[in-house]
Amino acid sequence: LINCKQIPLPKLGKEDLQKIISFFTMGHHLFDERYGHHAWKSFDIVKEGNTSPMIKHFPSIVRWLITCRKHTAVRDIEHLYLSILMPRNQIPWHVDMQQTDIYANSIITSISTANSFIEFENDKQYHYREGYSYLIKSGVKHRIMNLSDEYRVTLCLTPKENPYADMA
């Protein structure tokens, strides 16, 4: 992998997927539009270290976070959000930061990403394995395609320090 790499975090199960989808469909107004793109929404679970009470409705995410803090290099969480891309939609070509040669600090964990991919300019398409975590070089122009009839759901975690991003 060149612009995207899997990192050794515990696998996150799909036990909360239906709850996440229900929360999204019933609580749509609680989700923020990301970068002015109508098909891409997010909900902050942890923001500036403050945890939303909604986290208690997602026990597999809670267990995963506890395991990560206990058994991995991920410690303090600065930001954690659910990211949802509508079925048969895309996040157009964009960059998230200026530096193109380093991995971003944020960790993307796939919850439901079947029949979707991230593609980087002058590179290939990367397909996330559900339950696994990845780092991307978000300074490289990229897009996300959801070819599925289902919501594409990921968890984006930004720790205060991410040693996985420093490893080549």
Language-model regions, residue ranges each:
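Non-heme Fe(II)/2-oxoglutarate
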Residues: 1-74
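A short glycine-rich, His/Asp/Glu-containing loop-to-beta-strand
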Residues: 68-89
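A short beta-loop-beta micro-motif enriched in histidine and acidic residues
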Residues: 76-77, 90-106
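Short, conserved beta-strand element in jelly-roll/cupin
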Residues: 84-86, 99-116
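A short hydrophobic beta-strand segment most commonly corresponding to one strand
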Residues: 104-111, 133-135, 149-167
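A short beta-strand-loop-beta hairpin characteristic of the jelly-roll/cupin
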Residues: 110-129
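Conserved metal-binding segment of the jelly-roll/cupin
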Residues: 126-142
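Asparagine-centered strand-capping/turn motif at beta-strand->loop junctions
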Residues: 144-148
